[in-house]
Regions:
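C-terminal helical subdomain
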Residues: 5, 68, 91-116, 120, ...
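Active-site helix of classical SDR
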Residues: 8, 44, 52
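A short helix-coil junction within the Rossmann-fold of NAD(P)-dependent oxidoreductases
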Residues: 10-22
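Alpha-helical segment proximal to the catalytic Tyr-Lys
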Residues: 13, 57-61, 118
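Residue(s) in the substrate-gating loop at a strand-loop-helix junction
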Residues: 28
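Active-site loop-to-helix junction immediately N-terminal to the catalytic Tyr of the SDR YXXXK motif
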Residues: 34-42, 54
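Short, flexible catalytic-loop segment of classical short-chain dehydrogenase/reductase
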Residues: 49, 70-81
Length: 133
């Protein structure tokens, strides 16, 4: 949380000068729902959601949008290191029956950073294949 807070504090003055900006934070479905054995990770990612919503309220009137993305289990090196039996269970828990691809998450980041999302502020977007349904 400290790193996100410090970096955001550095860029906000520039965005305020422009009366425009988009901040897109990286949380996780674990920040929304928790996960066994991941107390510290869940707390950090939940904290990012709270920061996002607070900054959206504070900065939105000044032309700066703040949103966060909560990926589920995405085919990254970190997730691929999970034991195969656990990984198979995770895939079965999603309604898409597979891991997400990095590109699928990247497209959501690109959308939120663009003018195409000019009225999206304070949103928490889950990109998880429906794992929480």
């Amino acid at each position: 949380l400290k790193g996100v807070f410090n970096c955001t504090q550095l860029v906000i003055p520039h965005m305020l000068n422009a009366s425009y900006g988009s901040i897109v934070n990286a949380s996780s479905v674990v920040g929304l729902y928790g996960n066994f054995g991941q107390t510290n990770y869940a707390a950090c990612k939940a904290g990012l959601i709270a920061l996002t919503k607070t900054w959206a309220r504070e900065l939105g009137p000044k032309g700066i949008r703040v949103n966060t993305i909560c990926p589920g289990f995405i085919a990254t090196d970190m997730v691929k290191a999970i034991p195969d039996d656990v990984l198979k269970t995770l895939e079965e828990r999603t309604w898409m029956k597979r891991l997400g691809e990095v590109e699928e998450v990247a497209k959501v980041y690109a959308f939120l950073a663009s003018e195409e999302s000019s009225y999206v502020n304070g949103s928490v977007i889950e990109v998880s294949g429906g794992i929480s349904l």
